[in-house]
Amino acid sequence: MKLIIFTGLVLFAIVSLIEVQADNERACLPQYQVCTDAPGNCCSNLVCDCYGRYKSGARIGRNCFCLQKGVIYKREN
């Protein structure tokens, strides 16, 4: 009986470790991908940069994209 309980605990520990490793190894988001729901998932050379959307002075939403660190984007007319 003790052997069955011990085996079950060992299997549970192994499955837990596998799940933790899978979470740590998730793929990062490449440049220009939307990161609104996952701001920490951009690749290491990128940052999740967010912009508010406005219509007639009222905020209607927010967009976030993985962009290069240190780069400033300006609107062109």
From Swiss-Prot:
It is found in: Secreted. GO terms for cellular component: extracellular region. GO terms for molecular function: toxin activity. It comes from the Eukaryota. Residues 1-20 form the signal peptide. It holds the Pfam family Toxin_35. The keyword Lipid metabolism does not apply. The keyword Signal applies. Keywords: Disulfide bond, Secreted, Signal, Toxin. Contains 4 disulfide bonds. Expressed by the venom gland. InterPro entries: Spider_toxin_CSTX_knottin. Belongs to the neurotoxin 19 (CSTX) family. 08 (U8-Lctx) subfamily. This is U8-lycotoxin-Ls1f. It comes from Lycosa singoriensis (Wolf spider). The lineage of its organism: Eukaryota, Metazoa, Ecdysozoa, Arthropoda, Chelicerata.
